[in-house]
């Protein structure tokens, strides 16, 4: 099972992945987590470029699109391991939301694995910016607003659940468990 967490920066993806992993571990599932960008040399280069002041320019976004596609190919074996539950912090869907043009992004990611379930953690842009520390903030409010709109347009193309990530950590975690439970053979009504 390949479950992807998507959403703008500051939506709480990392926190919720860790909470879901713990819960799935407790329920006897073999769980592995992945993060995009990865810790590979390509991933490190992506992180470095994201720190640049011009990171949201068209030219840099196209460069990042190529680098993300390359970085993704490095983890394909892990994503294709059907013996485990894979929880991913982002996927090619992030590239579709963040970079353009969409047709080109789709083409360079045509070999990317499609998730079994996408959990879109939805949070307003102001909350996102407030949650991000200055050194972690890659995008401005205008750019994040555009990305959020892109996510909401794209999400219907995938098996998905939209989770209100503006509520408290525990409420978001419970909502995620209820969304994931049926895929894992767990009764969603038993989750509190």
Curated annotation (Swiss-Prot):
GO terms for molecular function: ATP binding; dTMP kinase activity. PROSITE patterns: THYMIDYLATE_KINASE. It is an enzyme of class 2 (transferase). NCBIfam families: DTMP_kinase (TIGR00041). Belongs to the thymidylate kinase family. PANTHER family: THYMIDYLATE KINASE (PTHR10344), UMP-CMP KINASE 2, MITOCHONDRIAL (PTHR10344:SF4). This is Probable thymidylate kinase. It comes from Methanobrevibacter smithii (strain ATCC 35061 / DSM 861 / OCM 144 / PS).
């Amino acid at each position: 099972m390949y479950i992807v967490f998507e959403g703008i920066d500051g939506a709480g993806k990392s926190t919720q992945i860790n909470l879901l992993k713990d819960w799935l571990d407790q329920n006897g599932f073999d769980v592995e987590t992945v993060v995009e960008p990865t810790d590979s040399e390509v991933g490190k280069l992506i992180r470095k470029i994201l720190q640049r002041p011009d990171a949201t320019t068209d030219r840099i976004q196209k460069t990042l699109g190529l680098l993300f596609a390359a970085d993704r190919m490095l983890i394909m074996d892990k994503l294709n391991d059907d013996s485990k539950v894979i929880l991913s912090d982002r996927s090619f869907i992030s590239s579709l939301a963040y970079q353009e043009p969409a047709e080109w992004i789709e083409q360079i990611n045509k070999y990317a694995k499609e998730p079994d379930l996408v959990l879109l953690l939805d949070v307003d842009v102001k909350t996102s910016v407030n949650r991000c520390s200055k050194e972690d903030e890659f995008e401005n409010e205008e750019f994040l607003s555009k990305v959020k709109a892109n996510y909401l347009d794209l999400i219907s193309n995938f098996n998905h659940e939209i989770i209100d990530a503006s509520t408290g950590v525990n409420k978001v975690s419970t909502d995620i468990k209820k969304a994931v439970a049926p895929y894992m053979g767990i009764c969603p009504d038993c989750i509190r």
